[in-house]
């Protein structure tokens, strides 16, 4: 297991209150865990990009879920009500699935 920090975006740099960072666990389909320390106001796109880069896969090939809801690039931990040690689940995107009648 390793810790990696998703760097805050430039609009987040002005707000440096204590306790603004939380640790999140990202768990893949293979049960692998990667821990991230993120600011409550950072867009989760940064975490998603960092995870995909570490896994060596394109971002559009995965979907990220928190409490069963898909995470949009512009969501923040604060908007989603995330807390310390919350879990983000990662699944491979599936396309197709039409019936052949």
UniProtKB/Swiss-Prot annotation:
Q: Does the keyword Secreted apply?
A: no
Marked site: Interaction with PIAS2: 36
> Per its UniProt record, what Pfam families does this chain match?
Rad60-SLD (PF11976)
SMART domains attached here? Answer: UBQ
Q: Which domain of life does the UniProt lineage start with?
A: Eukaryota
**Residues in Ubiquitin-like domain copies:** 20-97
Q: Please provide, alphabetically and separated by semicolons, the GO molecular function terms listed in this UniProt record.
A: potassium channel regulator activity; transcription factor binding; ubiquitin protein ligase binding
Q: Which residues carry this modification: N-acetylserine?
A: 2
Cross-link Glycyl lysine isopeptide (Lys-Gly) (interchain with G-Cter in SUMO1), where in sequence? 7, 25
Q: Which InterPro entries match?
A: Rad60/SUMO-like_dom, SUMO1_Ubl, Ubiquitin-like_dom, Ubiquitin-like_domsf
Q: Crosslinked positions for Glycyl lysine isopeptide (Gly-Lys) (interchain with K-? in acceptor proteins)? A: 97
Q: How is it modified after translation?
A: Cleavage of precursor form by SENP1, SENP2 is necessary for function. Polymeric SUMO1 chains undergo polyubiquitination by RNF4.
**Keywords attached to this entry:** Acetylation, Cell membrane, Cytoplasm, Isopeptide bond, Membrane, Nucleus, Phosphoprotein, Ubl conjugation, Ubl conjugation pathway
Q: Which residues form the propeptide?
A: 98-101
Q: Which part of the chain holds the cross-link Glycyl lysine isopeptide (Lys-Gly) (interchain with G-Cter in SUMO2)? A: 7, 16-17, 23, 37, 39, 45-46
Q: Which GO terms describe its cellular component?
A: cytoplasm; nuclear membrane; nuclear speck; nuclear stress granule; plasma membrane; PML body
Q: Does the keyword Phosphoprotein apply?
A: yes
GO BP term, example: cellular response to heat
Q: Which residues carry this modification: Phosphoserine?
A: 2, 9, 32
Position of the signal peptide: none
The text of the family note is: Belongs to the ubiquitin family. SUMO subfamily.
**What biological function has been recorded for the protein in this entry?**
Ubiquitin-like protein that can be covalently attached to proteins as a monomer or a lysine-linked polymer. Covalent attachment via an isopeptide bond to its substrates requires prior activation by the E1 complex SAE1-SAE2 and linkage to the E2 enzyme UBE2I, and can be promoted by E3 ligases such as PIAS1-4, RANBP2 or CBX4. This post-translational modification on lysine residues of proteins plays a crucial role in a number of cellular processes such as nuclear transport, DNA replication and repair, mitosis and signal transduction.
Q: Provide the assembly information.
A: Covalently attached to KCNB1; UBE2I increases cross-linking with KCNB1 and PIAS1 decreases cross-links with KCNB1. Interacts with SAE2, RANBP2, PIAS1 and PIAS2. Interacts with PRKN. Covalently attached to a number of proteins such as IKFZ1, PML, RANGAP1, HIPK2, SP100, p53, p73-alpha, MDM2, JUN, DNMT3B and TDG. Also interacts with HIF1A, HIPK2, HIPK3, CHD3, EXOSC9, RAD51 and RAD52. Interacts with USP25 (via ts SIM domain); the interaction weakly sumoylates USP25. Interacts with SIMC1, CASP8AP2, RNF111 and SOBP (via SIM domains). Interacts with BHLHE40/DEC1. Interacts with RWDD3.
What is the name of the protein in this document? Small ubiquitin-related modifier 1
Q: What is the lineage of its organism?
A: Eukaryota, Metazoa, Chordata, Craniata, Vertebrata
């Amino acid at each position: 297991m390793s810790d990696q920090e998703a760097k805050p975006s430039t609009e987040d740099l002005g707000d440096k209150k204590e306790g603004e960072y939380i640790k999140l666990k990202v768990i893949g389909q293979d049960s692998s865990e990667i821990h991230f320390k993120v600011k409550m106001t950072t867009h989760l796109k940064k975490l998603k990009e960092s995870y995909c880069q570490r896994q060596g896969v394109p971002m559009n090939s995965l979907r990220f879920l928190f409490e069963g809801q898909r995470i949009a690039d512009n969501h923040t931990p604060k908007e989603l009500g995330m807390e310390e040690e919350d879990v983000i689940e990662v699944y491979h995107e599936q396309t197709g699935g039409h019936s052949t009648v």
